[in-house]
């Protein structure tokens, strides 16, 4: 461990074989490009003391590989899985515009009050992810790499940067992007 405040790296998974809305209910693997871009994101030489990841294969497989290569412990936390898109899992926005345009529009305009059909609400998602985040509780100077999803990282960034939950979908989190959080802090 280093001296100073705890440091968290939030790494979004890379490109997957999935199409459309790929949330908690879509356990799709990375493409070769997805693997390469994640490795490239970590090529800057950061050293991690432990790795925590979502249970979904697009996060878990690279986390296992990176932890083994670095010789650091790995923890899988179900609470770091992506939002559950319910009936929209695996469906593209274009397909939904043909069959469920009104519901999709309501979700995009007001995701807090309009969840995907049979999916998870943003308030439920927030509660789950915040509980997982707070349990990270890194020690002083500890460096923790969290490999997760766009929704999870958007939520942590929204809390950290003061964005309202209603604007969550507008926060840019590209595939295989690394976001540094220093110092770590718990959220409510």
List PLM regions with ranges.
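Short, low-complexity, intrinsically disordered N-terminal peptides in bacterial proteins
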Residues: 1-7, 134, 183-188
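Glycine-rich phosphate-binding loop signature in dinucleotide/nucleotide-binding domains
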Residues: 3, 45-47, 136-142
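Active-site-proximal alpha-helix that buttresses catalytic centers in soluble enzyme cores
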Residues: 6-72, 99
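Generic beta-sheet signal
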Residues: 8, 140-151
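Short active-site segment of divalent metal-dependent hydrolases/proteases
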Residues: 16, 152-153
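Phosphate-handling substructures
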Residues: 29, 69-128, 170
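Short beta-strand scaffold positions
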Residues: 53-54, 127, 147-148
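Domain-level recognition of soluble alpha/beta enzyme cores
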Residues: 164-188
């Amino acid at each position: 461990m280093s001296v100073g405040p705890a440091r968290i790296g939030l790494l979004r998974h890379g490109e997957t074989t999935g199409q459309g809305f790929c949330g908690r209910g879509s356990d799709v693997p990375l493409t070769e490009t997805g693997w390469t871009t994640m490795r490239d994101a970590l090529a800057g030489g950061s050293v991690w003391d432990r790795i925590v990841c979502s249970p979904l294969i697009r996060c878990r497989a690279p986390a296992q590989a990176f932890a083994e290569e670095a010789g650091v412990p790995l923890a899988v936390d179900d609470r770091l899985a992506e939002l559950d898109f319910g009936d929209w899992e695996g469906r593209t926005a274009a397909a939904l515009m043909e069959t469920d345009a009104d519901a999709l529009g309501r979700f995009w305009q007001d995701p807090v009050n309009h969840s995907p059909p049979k999916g998870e609400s943003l308030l439920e998602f927030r509660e789950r992810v915040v509980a997982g985040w707070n349990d990270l509780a890194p020690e002083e100077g500890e460096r923790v790499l969290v490999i997760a999803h766009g929704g999870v990282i958007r939520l942590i960034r929204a809390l950290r940067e003061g964005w309202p939950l209603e604007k969550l979908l507008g926060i840019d989190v590209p595939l295989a992007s690394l976001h540094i959080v220093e110092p770590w802090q718990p959220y409510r």
